[in-house]
Regions:
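Short, acidic, metal-binding catalytic loop of nucleotide-sugar glycosyltransferases
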Residues: 22-35
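A conserved hydrophobic helix/loop-capping motif in glycosyltransferases and polysaccharide synthases
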Residues: 4-16, 20, 27, 42, ...
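Short beta-strand-to-loop acidic/aromatic patch adjacent to the donor-nucleotide binding site
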Residues: 94-109
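A recurrent flexible, glycine/aromatic-enriched loop bordering the glycosyltransferase active site
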Residues: 169-208
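Glycine-rich, basic loop-to-helix element that forms the pyrophosphate-binding segment
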Residues: 70-94
Length: 332
């Protein structure tokens, strides 16, 4: 019985978190593979009552749910690493307790039977280190790109007050032409996409293999809480473009690089860039500071790395990467 830990970092956005958890509990199927699933919420210093939400609305949930609160925002990389080090049954920080770990944004709505296909993809090849769920915007199918365009039109504004009902209403409009999000997920699953689509990347909702973390390392926590674009750094590390001192030809040879990609049978909806936005969040200032942090750490800009290496390894998603950045800037 494979043990799976799902970790969701949260910073406020209680209404978005409510909808995220509602769809998680509804659509996390386990019977086909006999999965033993647990959930941990990493609260990165929220002022919203996230603990009250979990203890109240989600008390007695389908599978064990744990809550870990940081006294302040420690950044996404620290929260991701807290997920990887978490265990309710073993000493915190000891060897990996779970067979696989899922890390997801809290601005995600999960589609029907989203989890089991991720495990099935991992089980096809023990050199797959990371596999991501498909989302609106994944560049593997035109309808996913269409859904991304509709998301830009209908998503709730992070600059205005919204409720869980507003969120579900926006999702209904986004997927109306397909009969709703659940119907859209079934449509995508029925299009015979490969179980594992190698080479694409997303850090919105992804599963990792502990052996890869042991070899390549944990996520980079420098410059927290703003960070350095931890997901980009990690994918470049997997490709051996960025090599911390512990990555050498002996410890991580070129011919043994880990594989990563999308799972063609796992579909979610992403409410683009709602994880850290709010009434007083300045996305442009945040991204500028990330760029400064990146250049201070690596000596060259992120633009240098995306120009020289994204085109080499990530060309299928380059346009989507740029589009996502523009979408994440604040509303005017």
């Amino acid at each position: 019985m494979p043990k799976i830990l799902i970790g969701i970092p949260v910073l406020d956005n209680i209404e978005m978190t409510r909808v995220c958890l509602q769809t998680l509990y509804k659509h996390t199927s386990v019977d086909r593979l006999g999965l033993d699933v647990s959930l941990v919420i990493i609260d990165n210093g929220s002022s919203d009552d996230i603990a009250g939400l979990i203890k109240g609305e989600f008390n007695g949930a389908r599978f064990p749910t744990y809550y870990l609160r940081n006294p302040q925002n420690l950044g996404v990389a620290r929260a991701w690493n807290q997920v990887l080090r978490f265990s309710a049954s073993a000493t915190y920080g000891s060897a990996f307790y779970y067979n696989y770990y899922v890390i997801s944004n809290n601005d995600v709505l999960f589609g029907p039977d989203w989890l089991q296909p991720l495990v099935e993809a991992m089980e096809t090849d023990d050199r797959i280190g990371l596999v991501s769920a498909l989302e609106n915007g994944s560049p593997v199918m035109q309808e996913l790109l269409d859904a991304h365009s509709r998301t830009k039109k209908y998503r709730v504004s992070p600059k205005k007050h919204y409720t869980s009902e507003n969120i579900m209403g926006s999702v209904k409009m986004i997927y109306k032409k397909w009969g709703g999000h659940e119907s859209f997920c079934r449509f995508v699953k029925g299009n015979n996409l490969p179980l594992f689509i190698k080479g694409n990347r997303s850090a919105v909702c992804f599963m990792v293999r502990p052996a890869m973390i042991q070899q390549v390392g944990f996520f980079d926590e420098d410059y927290s809480p703003i960070g350095i674009s931890e997901d980009l750094e990690y994918f470049l590390r997997i490709e051996r473009i960025i090599t911390p001192p512990w990555i050498t030809e002996n410890t991580y040879p070129e011919e043994k690089k880990w594989k990563y990609g999308f799972c063609g049978k796992s579909i979610i909806h992403h409410n683009w860039c709602m994880t850290r936005q709010g009434l007083h969040f300045d996305g442009r200032k945040w991204e500028k500071q990330k760029e400064k942090n990146w250049k201070a750490k690596f000596g060259k800009s992120k633009k240098y790395y995306t120009k020289h290496f994204l085109g080499m390894f990530f060309m299928p998603i380059l346009s989507s990467f740029l589009e996502d950045f523009l979408l994440c800037l604040p509303f005017h």
